[in-house]
Swiss-Prot record:
A Gene Ontology cellular-component term: nuclear origin of replication recognition complex
Residues annotated as domain BAH: 48-188
Notes concerning its domains: The N-terminus is dedicated to mating-type repression.
GO terms classed as biological process: DNA replication initiation; maintenance of rDNA; mitotic DNA replication checkpoint signaling; nucleosome organization; pre-replicative complex assembly involved in nuclear cell cycle DNA replication; silent mating-type cassette heterochromatin formation
Miscellaneous comment in the UniProt entry for this protein: Present with 3930 molecules/cell in log phase SD medium.
Name assigned to this protein: Origin recognition complex subunit 1
Gene: ORC1
Bias-annotated ranges (Acidic residues): 247-296
InterPro entries xref list: AAA+_ATPase, AAA_lid_10, ATPase_AAA_core, BAH_dom, BAH_sf, ORC1/CDC6, ORC1_wHTH, P-loop_NTPase
Length: 914
């Protein structure tokens, strides 16, 4: 919300104690540990305070209107910000699902079974526009979007003040619902606000989520009866001995599920000796729904019908003091009977009076066992597996409430509930042979995904077919970097998520795994299982859990999962087991898994993966070719839309851009501008865009490189503009280096000379307030981008060093390996010389390199100055070399990109003709 204190300009952070007294920095250090404090923000201009439980009206740029939130927490000094403001989201009337509303509150009405548009229109006419619906969805607020403080009241107070309310400030809340606008539950908003202020933020959010969940019936089991005061022996019978929670007049609740075993359960089956309880005989049951940092539950032994209970007599000294009645005369004040008292575990002492078991040891054992227990070990049979779609911890239901930023990007716009999707446009033709053409006609791809319409349609059809039929499939997407592979897949998933949100297709879970972001390849198992179940297991336990989930869990008890494996090249291992597992899971009958693998290598399956993996990838392969110059031109025009003929204000002394309030008109702005500030119009010529797209398309077809060239060209044009008018940066006048060395091809030189006069005329035509990006600026940017310092260095190397690199590139092309032995490179150099024996220049070079035809010096087996050439390439960072005694079998590898090495070699005319 505020990364620095500068972002809090106009606001101050206030901290108060339990009595409401303001605490300064010195008092904070003197306060005792555990003392409760409250934080709130105060605006200096009007004294408005924002704290927990307050409702605020914020501007919503995506919806073009305002939204209302209830502040839940102020986080100070986080990892990225000085202060963060997190709030619960209210839904307004147009964000509610009208059909779900009428089904819940008017189930017998005659208005049911009507078209969806009918409910939208009816609800817009009858709904109270100032009624809000509270949700448990968290969102981070930005202070610059703050409008005003909202006055939220319950239904009874609203009825009293109904005729005298401010529609922009006063609101009423009667229900809490899910973020999708369904399942309404009656609440008292005043009680909710009081509860949020009283408890911790995490507990408050869990409380609100529990309100929207369906209530579960729990069996009530009576707790232990009170012992007689005179009794000094304890009898534990009809069960295995267990350590129990001892409370005053408290009834315990126990889940009677016998098919599901928690991963923290520890089975104990040894016999017990009279008067002594062994540490191995205690079992700790950890509630999965509680936080791991809570105090652990006291160990209990489960009832077993097979074993016969024993009576264990405890001496007077062995009985815990907590089970004895409190003293009558003196003693501490009794605790609230509604709150259970945590007691120490009943443990015996050995002869040396050392405790048998420690709490923290049992807690660590339970945590460790949980991380190593796979999902498959928790069920005794397949029939015992519950419906995973109804469990709140599965499929990221809890994490989505916390990750509101990601959720806001994927959910539909809040302006209207129904969004027209591709599915809704072509659903009638989905079974026809013209479905691909219909998809291409249904959306204007030029507005957000130019030149990738066919690839979009192919991926969309494959993914849609698998989701609709509850089947599994694999989609292999390949192409060079920067051709729109990941962007296209994300647009497909975004479109499918919109259709899923409107119940057009079944719901599914989307997981994105990037191979470059994994510390080790096996981390992908942990990431995927964490997204599916919300648990964090070891990679081995996660892999076993995923195997069981995709193979054994029935289809009707789980969702479809769409996994994007981006940067697949980085996940290839020597054993290839990771790739095999992911692609093999899609062959299971119950999988419901869609794997979209994105790689930068066209023939990765055939080159680096075995036959068993290649056969499981299938035939759905979509190849992304490089962009043509026309497509790159369209992309640049799309990205630069709104840039041409845009204005900015610049300080002529410092060169800094000045931000001007857009509310005022041009005349008012000119009157308020200082003398040193000028208004400048930015313009990029069509010829500059044309040459940028053509040059990049001829090299790689990388859209990112083309945009990078345009950005750099704009920076060069800015420097030219500042130098032309004598302006400066930070008080220093900009001077262009006219003697700066540039490397151009012959074709580039002719193009620059032919356009130089035209650019000079354009500069003369431009007035002082126009900054134009000409073709010369683009050529300089291309020279910097395409001809890097590495390429410049390599073009100036000796012919011997160039011949070495050229031979290395030839070997890499022949056998497809990145590492080559030095002996093979020497043989390749000799082969190149023999093959080009008709080339007089090559033959003369060979005589020089191997000292051939000399009377005084015998012919050399190695190239002359071999060690010098090799060390020169190693010191420059162009090569990696393996350290071995035998140089001939040492392996070398390029430390630069292959494209840069090829481009540098192509600069040499002799090597280009070999």
């Amino acid at each position: 919300m505020a990364k620095t204190l500068k972002d809090l300009q106009g606001w101050e952070i206030i901290t108060t104690d339990e009595q409401g007294n303001i605490i300064d920095g010195g008092q904070k250090r003197l306060r005792r540990r555990g003392a409760k404090t409250e934080h709130y923000l105060k605006r200096s201009s009007d004294g408005i305070k924002l704290g927990r439980g307050d409702s605020v009206v914020m501007h919503n740029e995506a919806a073009g209107t305002y939204s209302v939130y209830m502040i839940q927490e102020l986080r100070l000094n986080t990892l990225n910000n000085v202060v963060e403001l997190w709030a619960l989201t209210y839904l307004r009337w147009f964000e509610v699902n009208p059909l779900a509303h009428y089904r819940q509150f008017n189930p017998d009405a005659n208005i049911l079974n009507r078209p969806l548009n009918y409910y939208n229109k009816l609800f817009s006419e009858t709904a109270n526009k100032n009624e809000l619906y509270l949700t448990a969805e968290l969102a981070e607020l930005q202070l610059f979007n703050f409008i005003r403080v909202a006055n939220v009241m319950d239904g009874s107070k609203w009825e009293v003040l109904k005729g005298n309310v401010d529609p922009e400030r006063d609101f009423t809340v009667r229900y809490i619902c899910e973020p999708t606008g369904e399942k309404f539950v009656d609440i008292n908003i005043e009680d909710v606000k009081a509860y949020i202020k009283k408890v911790e933020p995490r507990e408050a959010q869990e409380y609100l989520k529990d309100l929207t969940l369906p209530s579960k019936k729990k069996e009530i089991k009576r707790g232990p009866q009170k012992k007689d005061k005179a009794t000094q022996t304890a009898q534990i019978s009809d069960a295995e001995t267990r350590a129990t929670d001892i409370t005053d007049n408290e009834d315990g609740n126990e889940d009677e599920s016998s098919d599901y075993e928690s991963p923290s359960d520890i089975d104990v089956s040894e016999d017990m000796d009279s008067g002594e309880i062994s540490a191995d005989e205690l079992e700790e049951e950890e509630d999965e729904e509680e936080d791991e940092d809570e105090e652990e539950k006291e160990a209990r032994h489960t009832n077993s019908p097979r074993k016969r209970g024993r009576k264990i007599k405890l001496g007077k000294d062995d009985i815990d003091a907590s089970v004895q009645p409190p003293p009558k005369k003196r003693g501490r004040k009794p605790k609230d009977p509604s709150k259970p008292r945590q007691m120490l575990l009943i443990s015996s002492c050995r002869a040396n009076n050392t405790p048998v078991i420690r709490k923290f040891t049992k807690k660590n054992v339970a945590r460790a066992k949980k991380k190593y227990t796979p999902f498959s070990k928790r069920f005794k049979s397949i029939a015992a597996i519950p419906d995973l779609t109804s469990l709140p911890e599965f499929y990221g239901n809890s994490s989505e409430l916390m990750a509101s930023r990601f959720e806001n990007k994927l959910k539909t716009t809040q302006k209207h509930q129904i969004v027209e999707t591709i599915f809704s446009k072509v659903k009638k033709q989905l079974n026809s042979s013209y479905v691909k053409e219909e998809i291409l006609k249904s959306a204007n791809f030029q507005d957000y995904l130019p030149a990738r319409e066919n690839e979009f349609a192919s991926i969309y059809l494959s993914a849609y077919s698998a989701i609709e039929s509850d089947s599994a499939t694999t989609i292999y997407v390949a192409g060079t970097p920067g051709v729109g592979k990941t962007l296209t897949v994300r647009e497909v998933v975004k479109e499918l998520l919109s259709s899923s949100a409107q119940r057009e297709i079944p719901d599914f879970l989307y997981v994105e795994i990037n191979g470059l972001k994994m510390v080790k390849p096996t981390d992908c198992y942990e990431t995927l299982w964490n997204k599916v179940s919300g648990e964090r297991l070891t990679w081995a336990a996660s892999m076993e859990s995923l195997e069981f989930y995709f193979k054994r869990v029935p289809k009707n008890k789980k969702k479809t999962i769409v996994v994007l494996l981006d940067e697949l090249d980085a996940m290839v291992t020597k054993s290839q087991d990771i790739m095999y597992n992911f692609f093999n899971w899609t062959t299971y009958e119950n999988a419901k898994l869609i794997v979209i693998a994105v790689a930068n290598t066209m023939d990765l399956p055939e080159r680096q993966l075995g036959n068993k993996i290649t056969s499981r990838i299938g035939f759905t392969r979509i190849m992304f070719t490089g962009y043509t110059h026309e497509e790159l031109k369209n992309i640049i025009d799309l990205r630069l839309k709104g840039l041409n003929d845009s204005f900015f204000y610049v300080d002529t002394k410092t060169g800094n851009a000045i931000l001007i309030d857009a509310a005022g008109n041009d005349t008012t702005v000119k009157q308020t501008l200082p003398e040193d500030v000028r208004k400048v119009r930015l313009r990029m010529s069509a010829d500059a865009i044309e040459i940028a797209s053509r040059k990049v398309a001829s090299v790689s077809g990388d859209a990112r490189r083309a945009l990078k060239v345009c950005k750099r060209a704009a920076e060069i044009a800015e420097k030219h503009y500042m130098a032309k008018h004598g302006y400066g940066y930070d008080g220093k006048t900009v001077i262009e280096d006219e003697n700066e060395e540039q490397i151009y091809d012959d074709e580039d030189k002719d193009l620059i000379e032919s356009n130089k006069a035209k650019d000079d005329n354009d500069d003369d035509d431009d007035n002082d307030g126009v900054q134009t990006v000409h073709i010369t600026h683009v050529m300089k940017a291309l020279n910097e981008t395409l001809n890097s310092h590495v390429i410049t260095f390599m073009t100036r190397l000796s012919f011997t060093a160039k011949l070495f690199i050229y031979a290395l590139l030839n070997l890499m092309k022949k056998n497809g390996s990145q590492e080559q032995e030095l002996g093979d490179i020497v043989d390749e150099i000799k082969l190149l010389i023999e093959v080009n024996g008709s080339n007089k220049f090559v033959m003369e070079i060979a005589k020089t390199l191997f000292q051939q035809g000399s009377d005084n010096i015998s012919e050399q087996l190695r190239i002359i100055s071999w060690d010098f050439v090799l060390n020169q390439l190693l010191d420059a960072g162009i090569l990696f070399k393996q350290t071995m005694k035998n140089d001939r079998i040492c392996c070398v590898k390029l430390n630069i990109s292959v494209e840069e090495a090829k481009r540098a070699m192509n600069e040499d005319e002799t090597l280009r003709n070999l």
